[in-house]
Amino acid sequence: MVIIADSGGSKIDWRLLKKDGTIGQASSSGFNPYYQPIDHLKKIISEALLPQVSERVSKIFYYGTGVSSDKNVQSIQSVFAEHFPQAESEVGWDLLAAARALCGHEPGIACILGTGSNSCLYDGEKITGNVANLGWILADEGSGTYLGKQLIFDYFRKEMPESLAKQFHARFPWSREEVLEKVYQQEKPGAFLASFAKFIFQHLKEPYCYKLAYKGLSDFFENNVMKYENYKNLKVHFTGSIGFYFSDVLRQVANDKGITVKNILEGPIAGLTLYHQKDL
């Protein structure tokens, strides 16, 4: 059996590839070693994963956030070694998950467009380039946070069309002070800002919302994809909620810039399941 984990801060998607070709699955709360103790992962494995394991585990592929340090990688591997001492384990970051899920064994540019954004150059086996990720305050172009931040800016600065502003206020009747408190004083401000992307998507037929989305995605291409050498000769792929739901706008922006977009997935787990069939 091969176990695959796609881990984010809020949830982990598990897939269990069995010798007979069937695929088991499980879902659990998320894990980030920078913010949660390693015992949290142990509990997740015991409660959510182990009940689904019905045969010997030979390999484990764990992709997630917070695995940039060797210490965190070793901590995660040690937990798997406790539960599956006979299994080999590989721990990789979420960008590698995106590259493998989207590109498979072909070279290309893999992008994440969700709450945040990121991209990498992939040679078919490994990541060979990455435009520096500066987070939601400095960058994250095209992300839900980026779009939501612009929407909030336009609303309070009265740049949003009046009819749309009335609809926005009816749905989010917050004062400027309440919004500033959520952004500057409460937890997960990026996720809060990204939550407004749904409003943009639901009003994409409004010229204002379409232009906002187009501009945000154009900024992503210009500051990420177009920084890679030879980008026009490579296929560009996307995963993440913004890439998935705004795919029509995304493809239009790419077409206008002479860029070829191929795969767009809401999440990487299905692509990872296909990629790791060879490891059975």
Positions of the model-derived regions?
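Polybasic, low-complexity association/targeting segments
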Residues: F61-S68
